[in-house]
From Swiss-Prot:
Subunit structure of this chain's protein: Heterotrimer of A, B and C subunits.
Disulfide partners: none
Any one Gene Ontology cellular component term annotated for this protein: glutamyl-tRNA(Gln) amidotransferase complex
EC number(s) stated in the UniProt entry for this protein: 6.3.5.7
InterPro entries registered for this protein in UniProt: Amidase (IPR000120), Amidase_CS (IPR020556), Amidase_dom (IPR023631), AS_sf (IPR036928), GatA (IPR004412)
Name of this chain's protein: Glutamyl-tRNA(Gln) amidotransferase subunit A
Catalytic reaction(s) noted: L-glutamyl-tRNA(Gln) + L-glutamine + ATP + H2O = L-glutaminyl-tRNA(Gln) + L-glutamate + ADP + phosphate + H(+)
Keyword Ligase found: yes
Homology family: Belongs to the amidase family. GatA subfamily.
Pfam name, any one: Amidase
Alphabetical GO biological process terms: translation
Name of the gene this protein is made from: gatA
Protein purpose: Allows the formation of correctly charged Gln-tRNA(Gln) through the transamidation of misacylated Glu-tRNA(Gln) in organisms which lack glutaminyl-tRNA synthetase. The reaction takes place in the presence of glutamine and ATP through an activated gamma-phospho-Glu-tRNA(Gln).
Enzyme class: ligase
Length: 479
């Protein structure tokens, strides 16, 4: 079964009516993945024996029997988890991430693990030990990253929803590139227990789907407290679907000058059109400034790389993962295992982070980056004193060609310009399809104050109802 024209509600109805069984749905999903993925490469692991939970309750659990894709940096008991790295090529977890446990309780079906940039470090899903993923809209283009596999799996109709992780835009940028919806919740809204760490003060698990409501349904399940994660919030989780179907009259919408100045031509026209739709519906549009936007890329890459260099120290070739052969002593095991096990981009960021944390550079780099991060947070706090949401482009350009930017790390890093501020500030942010630019999807980014995912869903759903982008079929999937 291909899900290009399906959603969680439609599948739930078919399951309730007996039009299809959960067992057949799992089998058909795997069959479709094996056919479709020959040209997409969205998956690292596909469970060909995928089975639904027992005693399914389709009335109580909207996700019962629904196949969900899982990014391969989220721990799954008994299913290989590699983070798209050679160093974890044979890692078989013995426990589930909290989000997986919650989805199991909701009786969702797991069909496999999706491709990604190694350890979530990248913006194109080209930095994977298992090969690059292709964009379903144009197979010669990247799907974005690092959650490019999850995005491509949804956009190509292999699944209706997928989990991703977002450290600097890794859900929102691929969502924009693939013409789907993707949301990064507030830092602490969803447990990170069982998420392979990249930047621990930035990482957040989120959801990707073709329809806004599908992400709301999944976030309803995975959000909330967790005894295993000290950073997760105890705040009550609202029913995110209750924010759908509302109008935006009177909603105060901020549009950052710096974000609009970062785009031009057709991209600017597409984004402005969606802003005008909100204005015509009665939203109050306010031009604002995020003055520290010019510092977000260096700030982010210092903070994220520093945290990564610390988190990745655990991969030493001793406890688990790849161990180099023909080593002479313990130090040789460490050096060779890490040199051979990590890819170039991961090693680049480890070196950058190790330097920023070194005694001679700490005050000059990491400490200053932390201070600028505080200023960035204050910029957002000031705007949210008089505005409900912030909107603007998700990316500065549509998807670029495979191989075009992989040899230019600085150009690749600058792709994150418009998304990383939300991670530095810890606020919820999403990307919803806005239209096409040069035949490729472009996304409208929506941000709100901490724990106000409701307004993000409200605006995204309004945009979706207006432009009905979900009715479009990716051109790379047309026969």
């Amino acid at each position: 079964m291909n899900y290009l024209n399906e959603n969680i509600d439609s599948l739930n109805k078919k399951l309730q009516d007996g039009e299809i069984t959960a067992e057949d749905l799992a089998k058909e999903t795997v069959k479709n993945i094996k056919e479709t993925d020959k040209k997409i490469n969205a998956w690292i692991t596909v469970d060909e024996e995928a089975k639904p939970a027992e005693n399914l309750d389709f009335n109580k659990n909207k996700l019962a029997g629904i196949p969900i894709a899982i990014k391969d940096n989220i721990i799954t008991n008994g299913m290989k988890t590699t983070a798209a790295s050679h160093i974890l090529y044979n890692y078989m977890p013995v426990y589930d991430a909290t989000v997986i446990s919650k989805l199991k309780k909701a009786q969702a079906t797991f069909v496999g693990k999706t491709n990604m940039d190694e350890f979530a470090m990248g913006s194109s899903t080209e930095h994977s030990y298992y090969g690059e993923t292709h964009n379903p809209w144009n197979l010669d283009k990247v799907p974005g990253g690092s959650s490019g596999g999850s995005a491509a799996a949804v956009a190509s109709g292999e699944v209706v929803a997928a989990l991703g992780s977002d450290t600097g835009g890794s859900i929102r940028q691929p969502a924009a590139f693939n013409g789907i919806f993707g949301i990064k919740p507030t830092y602490g809204r969803v447990s990170r227990w069982g998420l392979i760490a990249f930047g621990s003060s930035l990482d957040q698990i989120g959801v990707m789907s073709k329809r806004v409501k599908d992400s709301a349904e999944v976030l309803n399940v995975i959000a909330g407290p967790d005894e295993h994660d000290a950073t997760v919030s105890e705040q009550e989780v609202p029913d995110y679907t209750s924010f759908l179907g509302q109008d935006v009259k009177g909603l105060r919408v901020a549009v950052p000058k710096e974000y609009m100045d970062a785009v031009d031509g057709e991209m600017r026209e597409v984004i402005q059109k969606q802003i005008d739709v909100l204005k015509d519906a009665g939203a109050i549009i306010n031009e604002v400034s995020l003055p520290h936007t010019k510092y977000v890329v260096p700030t982010y890459y210092i903070v994220a790389s520093s945290e990564a260099s610390s988190n990745l120290q655990r991969y030493d070739g001793i406890r688990y993962g790849y161990r180099a052969k023909d080593t002479k002593n313990l130090l040789d095991v460490y050096v060779k295992s890490r040199s051979e096990g990590f890819g170039d981009e991961v090693k680049r960021r480890i070196m950058l982070g190790s330097f920023a944390l070194s005694a001679g550079a700490y005050d000059e780099f990491f400490k200053k980056a932390a201070q600028v991060r505080t200023l960035i947070c204050r910029d957002f706090e000031k705007i949210f004193e008089e505005n409900d949401v912030i909107v603007g482009p998700t990316t500065t350009e549509p998807a670029f060609g495979i191989g075009e930017e992989i040899s230019d790390p600085i150009k690749m890093y600058n792709n994150d310009l418009l998304t990383i501020s939300a991670n530095l500030a810890g606020i919820p942010a999403a990307s919803v399809p806005a239209g096409l630019v040069d035949g490729m999807p472009a996304g409208l980014q929506i941000m709100a104050k901490r724990f106000d995912e409701g307004n993000v869903f409200k605006v995204a759903d309004f945009i979706e109802r207006n432009n009905k982008f979900y009715e479009k079929t990716p051109t790379g999937m047309e026969d």
